[in-house]
Amino acid sequence: MLKNNIEVDVKVKCIESGITQVQLADSIETTSSYVNRVIKKKDGIINKTFVRMMEELGYDIALIYVKKKVE
């Protein structure tokens, strides 16, 4: 099972970065409706088969976010 709530994670990271989802979509050259659809889709981020494989092996999945270092 995916332990993260992707929708909340993206919204929090947008707030931390001081941008909106619309601005995020613009910066990655896509639409805000597509960004919204991706983060709301339950199996859109992690492949369902991968989740089943990890569950069968006795694991849950937890994503961690590491801030990129600016040089």
Regions found by a protein language model. Give the residues of each.
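A short, Lys/Arg-rich alpha-helix, primarily the initiator
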Residues: M1-S17
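Helix-turn-helix DNA-binding elements, focusing on the entry/boundary residues of the two helices
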Residues: Q21, S32, N47-F50
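Short alpha-helical "recognition helix" segments of helix-turn-helix
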Residues: L24-A25
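Recognition helix of helix-turn-helix/homeodomain-like DNA-binding domains
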Residues: E29-G44
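DNA major-groove recognition helix of helix-turn-helix/homeodomain DNA-binding modules
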Residues: K48-L63
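Short amphipathic recognition helices of helix-turn-helix/homeodomain-type DNA-binding modules
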Residues: Y65-E71
